[in-house]
Every structure is written in C-alpha cells, then in structure tokens.
C-alpha cells in the first residue's frame, strides 16, 4: 500500500503565534487543528502515514520525496509557504494533494502545483481518493458537499505528532454553525 506523508506548513510570524512567549515555557507552537491527525485516522489500514508539522520540525525533503503521496493543508496565513513546498515537491516529481481552508476558498491558487485538490471537508473524499488512487483511477478534484456526521468521526491520530512540543491542543466536537444565514460566511 501507500507511504503517505501529511504536512502542516509553518506559520508566518503573527500576533496569534505566541512566538515570543513559547520559548519561555519550552514549547514550539500551538497544536495545529486536528485535520491531519484526522486524515491519518481516516486512512484505511495498510497504508503507512506520517505527519510533519513544520512549526515543530523542518521538512526532510529527501524523506518526503520517497513517499507515494504527500498531502498539505493550510490556512490563509500559510498559503505562501504551501506554494513554496509544492514547488519544491513538484520539482522533485512528488505526487501531491492539497486541501484545507485556503484551498476551499481559493483553489486556483494552486493550479499546476498539486496533482489533486480537496475542497471542503474530507471525511468521505479522503478514503474515496485513496481507494481510487490505489486502483489508478483518481480524479483531479474532490469536493465533499455533505456535512460530516461528527458522531462518526474517528479519534484523530495524535500519536503521529510530537505532542510534547506543543503549548496546548484542541478538541473538536462540532463544526461551523448549524444555521445557514445568507449574510454569514461561517
């Protein structure tokens, strides 16, 4: 089966990053959102998954280049770094997939850089992609249109993170807002 590496790109310096306070307590950053540990938990048995959080450790491009699939996620503040990473991986001939909040609102930002794009949540599309990829029949774009049933979401694979490096973590018990007010963008 596949060797999969999931990457959380480093954040740019920001007010929210706590860069000045973290060294005082011996930590490197806050725990990223659970999306990559959740993707790891959604990955069918038989695939090997590892997670690289660039906010904690540098990307070993030689190691990552040997993976069958490399996935990136990111928010608006990570978009520039996401492009840098994708360019490097593309130059090395690596098969890449990209998803997350920024891709979901600006998917053409990564045109020509990623082999596959995920829009929206990925609880149903990630396993579907892996099945299709294994059979050599994957698509270029996946979009999950249905809401995720949070009662069926597996426990994220936090064991794949260096949890002692983080100041604090987060848990997820719901997503967004259940209302669909037309004036709101949540």
Regions from the language model: what does each represent?
Residues 2-186:
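Acidic, low-complexity intrinsically disordered segments
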